[in-house]
Amino acid sequence: MSSNVIKVRKAEGKIKQLIQVGANSFFADEPEPVGNGQGPNPHDLLDSALGACTAMTVMMVAQRKQWPLQDVRVEITHQEDDATYKLVRKIELVGTLTEEQRAYLMGIANKCPIHKALHKKLEVESALVG
């Protein structure tokens, strides 16, 4: 599966970066004193990818099944040491769902593309250009 080319360039500020994803753009930064606190930091971006993907995947399945899911609220935190980066995900399903529907949607949460990607062997290939 191919993806958008993500472009990252320095923006105005200490270390603030402009991130362009297709036609969309946003900033990443670090809090003071390292940065200016004008955007999420890279860890927050990684963590939020899982949260957004979880909510979108669960909502899409519930809509397809015409279940009364009004909202999916996801809270992500992480814990890190030298050997492990642990994401803790709490999911709230808002709506008058049966226990069976809730259990099914919790299983779907683990099938979101980012959750699956984070459980694969990850490789990062870097090349110096220019």
What is the predicted function of each stretch?
Residues M1-S48, M56-G130:
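Extended beta-strand/beta-hairpin segments
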